[in-house]
């Protein structure tokens, strides 16, 4: 390749250097986003792997033999003894402080145990605890009677290797074997699982893959757009080289090198930029915790692969486009008219996703090997199909607009759109894809419904109260002493003991719980029978009970012969009072289960998997919209630069700049509005297909206000991108610039 021809093609004016700088800058932004998103995906996977041990459930700690002579009956349960290769573990699912859920694991082990606990090694001694750094900081900054007294004596911190993130709240406590067995919820553990998702692995993988495609696609679109900057000027120079004797192969190689060099510079700068932004990106909380900075590292091999792929693809596309150009082409290129066949990719993608949903309805056909490719592949086809069908719809709209045009700006804009629908739609394709992606994210995250606490009304547990079941074997005197201490706490209004025939964990507990009638008002009841002892159905204590339950006269005249089965502590509802009461109950030694409130139900919603991805959804919205805004600004500016000769001649003939502005605005508005409603509708339909394909029990609702804010931001970015080109329009269509052309 002749170096002189390369210099002639590349060097020449300030605009040429500006175009190369624009390509480098756009590629830098694209590569930076690609690496950060790649690192984020790797970080989420690494974070989930570190926290996988928290999913360990172990095996039963009791043995229930089959009764002799009756296979359907069972004998009394007997404890399975501890051995050196097992530990006794109790999972506390409702250890709550304020509105935060603390992962607590209680362990009891023999002194000769060989089981290693992730993050600490040997199990803690009874009365000691290990905490994550974030939880220990919280304990040290909080009065002990609100949090610290629940756990015992601090023994050390949990290593980062066992923590999902730096904000994780995890505590590992030591207890005696008798304490854990008495609670009835302990299990034997000989090792810890490394599967972070359990039965939700396929659903989690599907969501992450679709999310990655949804966010990566706009980034690739941005890179594609910026590498086409100044296409008209390039075509003119390359056509000149062809006319003076350069072979098509030579010109194609020149075009490839011209694009590859700034792309390489931009890609390298993008790698550096991603490295510098990594600490700031790690501060974004996902599912309640940030990521460690090291989680976002992709490694130099991955960075080199991204740089190589971006530069190679940019160079090959530039060379291919130049090789296809005619020898006499200078400014305008006649596009091939889009046909109705462009609808095929979109329809194929929709059919694939609908087939995946149909398979989930047929138990005999359900298989991740079928569902995952159909959902992910269908989504990718729909995403590409929107970009493919856009020019065809834009051309149809422009034909209608041309018939209805009543001004010069409308006629010129509609005529150009009809001649070049592909180039016109390309300028807004990023924003159209962003609206689709935002609609998908908003629709999918609309199933995230907070499980609100029931309102404070008679017949239901009050939201400001805490209750805990009493362990078997505790005397009324022990429970009464714990309630006496609870009444002395600041913010506690009452403390009530419920009685029954046996502890609620035992088979002969009975369906009713008994209270003193004098204590009933403290439980929120208004209609109280005129007896000394009253009864209520035991479902009164369940968090999911929504219908008020009535009090009835008890069939007994006194509590003699009954045992304490539950304690209920009423507070003034302040966080401090709730946490004091919770700490006292959990450390009293008489409760079989941790104290809980109906307000805690929100923290244990069954849709926690999707809740954890909500932040990713809104982050994806922001990334898609930001990239789309940049793409539209670059495309609109590029369109002005490519047509500055034509627009300049219009001004030279007397057309006001205001008319030129209206032309540019219409050329951006028509394709955007043409496909906007389609993108919104498809986005919510695809979200519904995804949601029902992952779990057919999920239901979508109206999107959050954030979605409408995102749509408004998209339109605002579109308006800003068009307005930003107005100054460019005036400068490059001035009389002096036109004479130079």
Q: Language model features by range: what are they?
A:
Residues 389-540:
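Juxtamembrane segments of multi-pass membrane proteins
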Residues 301-335, 360, 713-741:
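C-terminal membrane-exit region of the final transmembrane helix in multipass inner-membrane proteins
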Residues 1-218, 458-460, 555-618:
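Membrane transport/envelope proteins' first extracytoplasmic loop
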Residues 29-74, 278, 282-286, 359-369, ...:
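Alpha-helical transmembrane segments
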Residues 16-44, 202-234, 252, 259-273, ...:
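Hydrophobic alpha-helical transmembrane segments of multi-pass inner-membrane transport and secretion
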Residues 271-299, 365-373, 680-714, 723-739:
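Short helix-loop junctions at transmembrane helix boundaries
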Residues 1-32, 339-345, 352, 392-435, ...:
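N-terminal Sec/SRP start-transfer signal
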């Amino acid at each position: 390749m002749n170096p002189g021809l390369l210099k002639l093609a590349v060097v020449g004016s300030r605009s040429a250097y500006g175009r190369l700088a624009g390509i480098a800058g756009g590629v830098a932004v694209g590569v930076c986003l690609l690496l950060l998103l790649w690192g984020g995906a790797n970080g989420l996977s690494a974070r989930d792997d570190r926290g996988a041990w928290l999913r360990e459930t172990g095996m039963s700690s009791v043995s229930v033999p089959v009764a002799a002579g009756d296979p359907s009956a069972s004998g009394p349960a007997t404890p399975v003894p501890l051995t050196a290769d097992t530990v006794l573990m109790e999972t506390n699912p409702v250890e709550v402080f304020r509105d935060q859920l603390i992962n607590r694991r209680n362990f009891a082990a023999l002194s000769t145990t060989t089981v290693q606990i992730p993050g600490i090694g040997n199990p803690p001694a009874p009365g000691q605890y290990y905490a994550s750094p974030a939880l220990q900081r919280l304990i040290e900054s909080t009065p002990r009677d609100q949090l610290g007294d629940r756990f015992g004596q601090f023994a050390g911190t949990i290593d980062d290797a066992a923590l999902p993130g730096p904000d994780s709240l995890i505590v590992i406590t030591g207890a005696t074997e008798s304490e854990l067995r008495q609670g009835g919820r302990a299990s034997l553990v000989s090792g810890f699982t490394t599967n972070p998702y359990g039965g939700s692995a396929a659903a989690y993988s599907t969501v992450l893959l679709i999310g990655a495609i949804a966010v990566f696609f706009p980034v690739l679109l941005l890179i594609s757009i910026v590498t086409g900057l100044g296409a008209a000027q390039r075509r003119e120079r390359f056509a000149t080289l062809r006319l003076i004797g350069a072979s098509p192969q030579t010109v194609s190689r020149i075009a490839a090198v011209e694009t590859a060099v700034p792309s390489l510079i931009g890609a390298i700068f993008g790698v550096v930029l991603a490295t510098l932004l990594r600490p700031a990106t790690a501060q974004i909380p996902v599912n309640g915790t940030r990521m460690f900075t090291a989680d976002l590292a992709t490694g130099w091999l991955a960075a080199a692969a991204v740089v190589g792929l971006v530069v190679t693809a940019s160079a090959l596309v530039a060379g291919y486009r130049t090789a296809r150009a005619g020898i006499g082409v200078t400014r305008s290129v006649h596009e091939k008219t889009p046909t109705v066949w462009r609808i095929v990719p979109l329809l194929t993608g929709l059919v694939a996703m609908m087939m995946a949903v149909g398979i989930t309805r047929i138990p005999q056909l359900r298989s991740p090997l079928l569902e995952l490719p159909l959902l992910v592949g269908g989504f990718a086809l729909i995403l590409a199909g929107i970009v493919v069908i856009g020019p065809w719809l834009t051309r149809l709209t422009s034909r209608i607009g041309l018939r209805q045009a009543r001004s010069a700006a409308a006629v010129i804009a509609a005529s150009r759109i009809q001649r070049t629908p592909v180039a016109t739609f390309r300028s807004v394709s990023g924003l159209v894809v962003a609206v689709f992606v935002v609609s998908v994210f908003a629709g999918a995250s609309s199933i995230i419904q907070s499980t609100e606490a029931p309102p404070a009304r008679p017949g239901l547990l009050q939201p400001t109260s805490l209750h805990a079941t009493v362990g078997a074997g505790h005397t009324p005197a022990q429970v009464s002493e714990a309630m006496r201490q609870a009444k002395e706490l600041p913010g506690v209004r009452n403390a009530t003991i419920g009685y029954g025939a046996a502890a609620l964990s035992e088979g002969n507990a009975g369906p009713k719980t008994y209270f003193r009638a004098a204590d009933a008002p403290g439980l929120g009841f208004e209609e109280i029978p005129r007896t000394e002892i009253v009864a209520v159905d035991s479902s009164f204590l369940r968090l999911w009970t929504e219908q008020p339950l009535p009090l009835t006269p008890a069939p007994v005249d006194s509590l003699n012969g009954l045992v304490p089965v539950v304690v209920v502590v009423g507070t003034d509802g302040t966080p401090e009072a709730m946490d004091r009461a919770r700490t006292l109950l959990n450390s009293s030694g008489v409760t079989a289960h941790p104290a809980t409130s109906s307000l805690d139900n929100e923290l244990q919603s069954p849709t926690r998997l999707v809740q954890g991805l909500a932040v990713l959804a809104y982050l994806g919205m922001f990334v898609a919209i930001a990239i789309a805004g940049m793409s539209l600004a670059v495309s609109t500016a590029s369109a002005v630069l490519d047509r500055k000769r034509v627009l300049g001649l219009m001004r030279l003939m007397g057309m006001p700049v205001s008319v030129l502005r209206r032309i540019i605005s219409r050329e951006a508005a028509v394709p955007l509005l043409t496909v906007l409603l389609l993108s919104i509708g498809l986005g919510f339909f695809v979200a519904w297909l995804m949601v029902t394909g992952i779990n057919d029990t999920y239901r979508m609702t109206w999107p959050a206000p954030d979605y409408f804010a995102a749509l408004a931001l998209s339109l605002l970015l579109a308006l800003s991108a068009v307005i930003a080109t107005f100054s460019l329009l005036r400068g490059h269509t001035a009389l002096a610039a036109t004479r130079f052309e």
